[in-house]
Amino acid sequence: MPRINFIFGVHNHQPLGNFEWIIKRAYEKAYRPFLETLEEYPNMKVAVHISGVLVEWLERNRPEYIDLLKSLIKKGQVELVVAGFYEPILVAIPEEDRVEQIKLSKGWARKMGYEARGLWLTERVWEPELVKTLREAGIEYVILDDYHFMSAGLSKEELFWPYYTENGGEAIVVFPIDEKLRYLIPFRPVNETLEYLHSLADEDESKVAVFHDDGEKFGAWPGTHELVYERGWLKEFFDRISSDDKINLMLYSEYLSKFRPKGLVYLPIASYFEMSEWSLPARQAKLFFEFIKKLKELNLFEKYRIFVRGGIWKNFLYKYPEGNYMHKRMLMLSKLLRNNPTARIFVLRAQCNDAYWHGVFGGIYLPHIRRAVWRNLIKAHSYLEPENRVFDLDFDGGEEIMLENENFILVVKPHYGGAIFEMSSKKKYVNYLDVVARRWEHYHSLKDIPEGMKRELSYDKWPRGMLQDHFLLPTEVLDNYMLSKYRELGDFLMSSYHYQIEDKLRLWRSGKVKGISVEVEKVLRLNKDGFTTEYRIVSKEELGLMFGVEINLAVQGTVEYPAEFMSKEIEVKDIFGKVKIESEKEAKIWKFPIKTLSQSESGWDFVQQGVSYTFLYPIEKMLNIKLKFKESM
């Protein structure tokens, strides 16, 4: 009788730094009831991957889940599939770290009583060089999307077998996940999944259909708990799939012990199809979306889809400079702390992928997720002896200056207006400059955005830092400034400054303001409670303008509103504690929240990424300013 082998798998993950209540809700709505339901069906088999962040939470908070999982492994109902333990994008971290991450995951599986041989590839981000890594880490098979195989030229009919892939003389088995099953399960009636699997039944005993997708689909996603548990979808699915004569339930390891892969394929750099849209720069992503829409209107998409390719995951590091900077700080620390096992665990945690990219929801736009990465990066950095360094940290071709003492790490980009782009506290493990700029995203279609939000919507022309130098008309207003509708009269913001490092950092530049020659010099001194900066601005002619020093801070837990006032200081209170910025001279101060617009499960959301504070001083021919940034415990 024709039959189809069927492998069913779930991937459970929570981002580093996610809110406790979200993890608890996912546990109660998805992880716990799924495993308890599985226990009721002894003939049902599931391949399970759990990321390290979630593993650590479960071990601390829900040991009974771990015990139940161990029991199901012992009964042969569950096969553990591993990954990089803290869920990194493997191709985005050094080779040594890849192996270490996978071996950490394999070590946990061994503790659970299982010798794991298979790998769930995070976000299915594949590059051929991974073959060597995976083999070195003791991995025999890896699970990818069928899109990877179609991108290599395989037809849909050829996607129901695993294959070998080779690189540099090493080979590994690759299983394709069936896309149609991902859309059927659990959203469509069980009968539709059964009918589809029956349609695949074949006399070839080695034919296999693979479903492996997010475990959160089974209860944590909106509306799924009611569908999957209250309306009995999962029980019906387990009951019918495990008793169907035409369907042979298997685990990956069982399949490989019985059948050989179909042959040899060479897979290109790829992830799942949607990722190729999201990773493109916003304007190209919009064109890509329109192109797909046009193909669908012409009924050509399915026929020619294998030739439609967008961007690759690493494009996100180009698309979001803040993510790239965080990524390069991680690479720096990975290299410098290679032989420090205590510090390395913080580096490995900071490699958790979620904070480095953005699809439709969350990702880099979630401050609490970035904050957790920075916390671990700064903890790791604290194991290094403080020293000043000059090097191209973020691989943009310009040298960064890293000033450091026992309490702080301060990074200046002379080629980006001589501004500060990292101010990290070793006492509080916080980067005060963890601020993502406001950017246009390809899904920002104005017809969809609520009217009230449109009025606040604005996009930044440059990344946000500290000590960013503005020349403005005295009649300029805060409303224009915060909506990026003002006129910048100088050429200092994004231009290169000269620098000299002694016991202090001196930065200077000769530029133009309304065609007039102007020199700006700023001198930075790092001290035990923050830093001081002294400005000296000299113009060859009278300017009659305002000089503004902009300081952006990662104020993310206190809701702020635009304000204008006169003062010599501001005190900022947030989840990181208190900081104070003092000016020797009274200044007009502009304050406004930096809010990015992104989508969530509930619709559109503004997310406060930080707050901009600009100290404004009148300038004619000469101006001297002294500012202090002070951290309070």
Swiss-Prot record:
CDD domains for the chain: GH57N_TLGT_like (cd10793)
GO biological process, one term: carbohydrate metabolic process
Catalytic activity of the protein: Endohydrolysis of (1->4)-alpha-D-glucosidic linkages in polysaccharides containing three or more (1->4)-alpha-linked D-glucose units
UniProt GO MF annotations: alpha-amylase activity; carbohydrate binding
TM segment ranges: none
Keyword Hydrolase found: yes
EC number(s) reported in the record: 3.2.1.1
Superkingdom as given in the UniProt entry: Archaea
Keywords, alphabetical: Carbohydrate metabolism, Glycosidase, Hydrolase
Active site: residue positions: E123 (nucleophile), D214 (proton donor)
Family assignment from sequence similarity: Belongs to the glycosyl hydrolase 57 family.
PANTHER family hit by this protein: ALPHA-AMYLASE-RELATED, ALPHA-AMYLASE-RELATED-RELATED
Name the UniProt record assigns to this protein: Alpha-amylase
Lineage, uppermost ranks: Archaea, Methanobacteriati, Methanobacteriota, Thermococci, Thermococcales
